[in-house]
Amino acid sequence: MQIKHLITLFFLVLIVADQCSAFFSLIPSLIGGLVSAIKGGRRKREIAAQIEQYRDLQKREAELEELLDRLPMF
């Protein structure tokens, strides 16, 4: 084989190996995603906690606006 063909073959093998390693590194995260999707209950609790935090934030913003409205303008 000529050196040009060997270099081309080397790069092709390198690209395929890189793609395979990327695919194999995705497998654990895919399994973790499937497990969390099957459980499901934890996600609902997380969303409920986020909604509660958002409501608290809205309440604090309203209190801050009310406080700023009471301050005198200079």
Swiss-Prot record:
TM region positions: none
Domain of life where this protein originates: Eukaryota
Main subcellular location of this protein, as a coarse class: secreted
GO cellular component, one term: extracellular region
Gene Ontology terms: biological process: immune system process
Compartments reported by the entry: Secreted
Signal peptide bounds: 1-22
Lysine amide modified-residue sites: 39
Residues that make up the propeptide removed upon maturation: 40-74
Family: Belongs to the non-disulfide-bridged peptide (NDBP) superfamily. Short antimicrobial peptide (group 4) family.
Protein name: Peptide ToAP4
Organism for this UniProt entry: Tityus obscurus (Amazonian scorpion)
